[in-house]
Amino acid sequence: MNASCKRIVLGIANVMSWPWRLLPSGLREGILTGLFVLDSRGEPRDGLAQLLRLQDRLDWVTNERAVAMGDGVHPKHRLTRYHDFFVEHIPAGTRVLDIGCGVGAVARSIATRVKGSEVVGVDRDDGRLAEARAADNPENLSFVKTDVCDSLPDGPWQAVVLSNVLEHIEDRVGFLKTILQNAKPERVLIRVPHFERDWKMPMRKELGLNYFSDAEHFIEHRLDELNAELAEAGLRPMVTQTLWGEIWMCCECTESDGQ
């Protein structure tokens, strides 16, 4: 479902929800559960596949409500504390390039919490950059519109942040090599979704269903897959954590890259 369709669905739901919500919550839950059970009957394989497709829709609505509750910021930033990983692995006084910064949440945390840092967030989405620039930003944080496959802000940069970026890139090794050549970082901090986060991921793959958390993903890595790509690109993980269904890494450039 594209963004326009989602907006239409949500608009209709906002209008039609009030009579539905007049029913007691227990009754509403019972009706919905019954519908899920009815829809899953028949051949077990088909029923499981249908439930997993419905789960995708439910996840979309859950995330929409979470962002609304957070006044435009998903509470995962606060609850999973993944910002801390980036902050803790960036030394004071570092020049940081946050590639694919989105609305600037990670870049803002780094700029605010890493003493003496200079942070530039880059993205190619005008809407997200407008939201990032409109926030309460510290003086050591700025945002630039660019496609990093074509150009980067003037470096060198001591640290490059790739938070939920690599999975959106088809030629990830080529992309990383370009970043290392042009930005010349001392370290690269990476966050990607972990394929082995849940039994449902390989089950989805076995059933021929979508097993990505975003329709724009080309991959959701196993740890060995990510390590192989990083090695080919010229990066060596110094720190690796698997938390919250994600892989977090702080990498250094290998000597073979001349970094």
Per-region residue spans from a language model:
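Hydrophobic adenine-recognition pocket in adenosine-nucleotide-binding enzymes
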Residues: 165
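A conserved beta-strand element that flanks and buttresses the S-adenosyl-L-methionine
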Residues: 161
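Acceptor-substrate binding/catalytic loop of class I
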Residues: 208-224
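Conserved N-terminal segment of class I S-adenosyl-L-methionine
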Residues: 2-155, 176, 205, 216-219, ...
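A short glycine-rich, Lys/Arg-flanked "PGG" loop and its adjoining helix->strand segment in the class I
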Residues: 174-187
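Conserved class I S-adenosyl-L-methionine
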Residues: 189-211
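A SAM-dependent methyltransferase catalytic signature shared across enzymes that methylate proteins
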Residues: 223-240
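Conserved acidic residues
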Residues: 94, 158, 186
